[in-house]
């Protein structure tokens, strides 16, 4: 993954660099409590979606043990310790080789990338959009949305009055 890029996006969106919790509907920053390692080690996560990262090979044992006990979805370009423990694993195209985008160097310099050649596998964005669409369909099927449509319909189903 591109840790610096992920940190830059979180900082841009919230003002905090990492360790951000959105469970109350707004960002809260506490790196001793809300980092991925803390959340998993404390047993606070009820599911995990892991993208282009392999915590199964380098997180503390307590965090990995919790991952083994919750639903885990992984998107990665290769087989890893984390894809092996996942309930669902998607093999994806490699960004910067098969897909375009932007990565950030460790000194925060952005580098635009163009695809060098095609992949038989979908990119992360395609998979994430398909997952979002299916989750919305399941939410709407389960809940009455009171006549709303689109995103409002999903919001009404998820947050009933």
Predicted regions and their residues:
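Non-catalytic alpha/beta scaffold blocks inside enzyme catalytic domains
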Residues: 1-161
């Amino acid at each position: 993954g591109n840790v610096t890029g992920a940190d830059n996006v979180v900082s841009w969106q919230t003002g905090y660099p990492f360790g951000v919790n959105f469970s109350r509907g707004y960002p809260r920053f506490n790196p001793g409590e809300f980092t991925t390692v803390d959340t998993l080690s404390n047993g606070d996560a009820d599911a995990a979606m892991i993208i282009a990262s392999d915590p199964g090979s380098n997180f503390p044992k307590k965090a990995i043990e919790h991952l083994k006990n919750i639903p885990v979805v992984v998107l990665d370009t290769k087989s890893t310790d984390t894809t092996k423990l996942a309930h669902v694993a998607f093999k994806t195209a490699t960004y910067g080789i098969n897909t375009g985008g932007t990565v950030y160097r460790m000194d925060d310099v952005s580098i635009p990338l163009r695809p060098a050649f095609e992949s038989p596998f979908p990119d992360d964005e395609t998979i994430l959009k398909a997952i979002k669409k299916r989750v919305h369909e399941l939410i709407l099927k389960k809940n009455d949305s009171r006549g709303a449509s689109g995103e409002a319909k999903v919001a009404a189903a998820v947050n009933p009055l």
